[in-house]
Design a protein with these regions (language model features):
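An N-terminal assembly and electron-transfer interface module characteristic of large anaerobic redox
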Residues: 1-322
Length: 322
């Protein structure tokens, strides 16, 4: 058998957040309660599908299994279903008691330890899922993983109970945190320069950030930006477009006390945005940090560089000249 050469074209959806919704059950429980559990799984998944979107507005894939996890064999089956669908976030909606080791723990064994998992449950019911939730969360904590518990409300009776609005809101909030975690994993932020304030909050903790979030920190020297400004390593036509756009929106509020000098510095500030933006695209970065302190723009021993405030404002906005 020959080795397979992979295509250089990668599906853009590879590694995207996918939420899998499931429920455990107890094989001794009556059929009506089992059907109710399946309906809760379906309802929770449908509600999330209508609420969860990525930053670009595209819907996040939500999948669910109507196989109730009674024991290890069902846990394996649902886990494989989820893995085929690319699931990397787990939402468990238990409505009955069950056995943690035979159910969710066996399912979790198929996934990386840092896979986000949420338990959303009602607070009572004849065979309370909330008891299962706390027992399972305790078992998971004992092997060194934290989970999120959302004890909410849905009707104790009826075959198709719906979680109330607050329960759903809490679950949706958690899902957004989870898709952010998954979306950042394997990505990077770019940090230019060092910290000159001596503040702990300004230090880039490379190892902890990698271990906790799977997020890399690319560190670049400020010299690169200084050189690229000097070499005018940016699209000059785009700079004109950006300056025109800025003046079109804020011309009366732009103060240039030393007209020619300050106008040139304004252009450099805008050029800095274009340079850093292109570097971030090149590195596939999702964010960054910039040391805009004494030696960059104010040290009389050096060449004055443009203030980075405009660049920062544009990066923290959802729009620019494009």
């Amino acid at each position: 058998m020959n080795a397979k050469l992979l295509s250089r074209e990668v599906n853009k959806g590879t590694g995207a957040p996918v939420i899998g919704v499931f429920a455990p059950c107890d094989p001794r429980i009556d059929q009506a309660s089992r059907e109710r559990s399946i309906n809760i799984v379906k309802s929770a998944a449908q509600k999330l599908a209508s609420k969860i979107k990525q930053p670009d507005g595209k819907a996040v894939d939500i999948v669910y299994s109507d196989i109730l996890i009674d024991a290890e064999s069902q846990a394996d089956q649902v886990a494989r279903q989820f893995k085929e669908a690319g699931v990397n976030i787990l939402v468990c909606v238990p409505d009955t008691w069950s056995f943690p080791q035979l159910t969710t723990l066996s399912l979790m064994a198929h996934f990386p330890k840092d896979t986000p998992i949420n338990f959303t449950t009602g607070n009572s019911a004849p065979r309370p899922g909330v008891v299962y939730t706390h027992a399972t969360a305790g078992a998971i904590a004992q092997f060194g993983k934290l989970t999120h518990i959302n004890v909410g409300k849905w009707p104790d009776t009826g075959q198709a109970p719906e979680m109330d609005d607050q329960t759903l809101e809490n679950l949706v909030d958690w899902c957004y945190a989870a898709i952010t975690f998954i979306g950042l994993r394997g990505r990077r932020v770019v940090v230019f320069g060092h910290d000159s304030m001596g503040m702990e909050t300004a230090l880039a903790h490379v190892l902890e950030t990698r271990n906790q979030f799977g997020l890399e920190i690319t560190r670049l020297d400020m010299k690169l930006l200084s050189d690229m400004l000097q070499k005018e390593s940016y699209d000059k036509e785009e700079l004109k477009k950006l300056r025109s756009w800025l003046e079109g929106h804020a011309k009366d509020r732009i103060e240039l006390p030393e007209l020619e000098k300050d106008s040139e510095l304004l252009d450099k500030s805008l050029a800095l945005y274009l340079i850093v933006r292109d570097l971030m695209v090149e590195l596939d970065a999702v964010g960054g940090g910039f040391m805009s302190q004494l030696e960059w723009g104010s040290d009389s021993r050096a060449i004055q560089q443009p203030v980075a405030d405009i660049m920062e404002s544009l990066f923290n906005s959802t729009f620019d000249h494009n």
